[in-house]
Amino acid sequence: YRTVALIQTGGAMIDASLRVLRTDVAGMPIEWIGFEEAVRLHCLDQILYPMGSVLYHVHGGINARSGEQSTLAIHSIICTAGQSRAYLKRLPSYAPPLNNSTLFRRDANLCLYCGDQFRNTDLSRDHVEPLSKGGRDVWQNVVTACKRCNHHKGSRTPEEAGMQLLAVPFVPTHAEYIYLSGRRILADQMEFLLAHFPRNSLLHSRLNAGDGNSHPQRR
């Protein structure tokens, strides 16, 4: 079961787990933010324009003259002021931060040795070229592996261990990383992110096939 945090705003309860997709001035996805941060950006006049559906209606104070209560609509996607990060798409050396949760999601929670699907808690990060042999802890040298396969492989290469790698590890683009780090992505947010994926994106192909958001199976 998933625990949903509910916050009372203006007398109504809202699901605080829904995230807002923030973009830069050029429309490039930057990060996921909560509704509190979205309200703060509104107050600082940092939102250029909203996109997508309305997630929340946040109620403010009551105007002493008109007696009307202010209401702020928080959209699923917001374009914000500031420096454009579009240059990230043109940097061949750009690599997003590496962490296990996004790595496992990149590989669809599949062990890339045995091919079975697992929960995050039953998975591990495997270095194709072991660190002890000079391998690096980078996207293109790490794959998702179940703990049994990782233990069997040990500090050997797949060839030395007689194990076949089922897919070639790749470095996600910035937009792909935003997708990988997201949770409960809404349809309009997903459509927006897909438009920023490369044409040859492996993630794009997987999502079109309908298994990009598959959940780990219980084992």
Predicted features along the sequence, with ranges:
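A generic structural motif
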Residues: 26, 136, 149-151
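Short helix-coil boundary/hinge micro-motifs
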Residues: 4-95, 100, 163-219
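Short metal-coordination and nucleic-acid-contact micro-motifs, chiefly zinc-binding Cys/His arrays
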Residues: 104-109, 138-142
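Histidine-centered nuclease catalytic patch
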Residues: 96, 116-144, 153-169
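Short cysteine-rich clusters marking metal-coordination/redox-active sites
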Residues: 111-114, 146
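Short, conserved, surface-exposed binding loops centered on an aromatic residue
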Residues: 102-106, 115-117
